[in-house]
């Protein structure tokens, strides 16, 4: 079985490399490298090159070590979104950069960036990734953020308030909206990388592309497996540095912390899933509410759809095969979900919505059994760090859904309130 897995990984890497031949900094003919095992992430492949004498290049006089991170395009099967060459800082890393440059080829089919690691200054456009960096022990790397009003991390707010104070330690600059970031502020930050969310048919990043700063396209949110998204922290751990292992002025890697954190999350998630499977099928759960004329609900193979399945809850679209959201009409939802036991949704800002307010929004809500029984659960994402915590901690959201489906034998709800 293990041999089959290795062969499969090798074939996958070969296909990814073939789809990205002719890149700006080719790892190409150096060595095949060792592919890291990714149990759940389908969009990320990491290949490590170099580990002592076996990979020393006698002709080049280099004992090289570097890694490749290959990000598959979530919106176009069989193609690459981005390729990253992670090369350690320091003298040996400088030699590796020069070696790869001499092997450079042309006619790139996908974007490739060389990133010197560990990254010690970064603009981070995504709140969950800011939270993750705190957990990995590298919050000082965050030097700029976007959409500050939507970030529920007290220390980020505190450090952002110190922006402009020349005596402040590790202040954070508000770079404006992630859809139209303040380029001048980003230039002033002098970041070593920019971390952002890619979107389908975005057409690139405009002026950001012209800064010649590596753009880390965090496509983790497109993973359908809850643990698949969390597993991306292994990549981010390789990218960023912490103060603990600092040597010769260069930060230590967050990679060991990321690996151990993911192992802990995986163990807890699988334990909860196994416990939930031991109970009878739980209550039926409907998520979200109407937006305009559309009611968006998770597809059966989406992250939330899989979480509901792993919670052993009933879900009206559990047989659906889509991995993204389903855009349904309110009439379609009511026709299929009138008898749902629990209605759980998110909102932003203000007091929890009363039943009267919900009916003002849409009178059809009164047709839901969960509405009439008062089984309405809400989470205010303006005050509760829901996205910040659950994006890379699916075990927290799994526990939440288990409680909603099976009662409080697993404890009290952390995010949703009745």
Model-based region annotation:
Residues 1-29:
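Bacterial Sec-dependent N-terminal signal peptides
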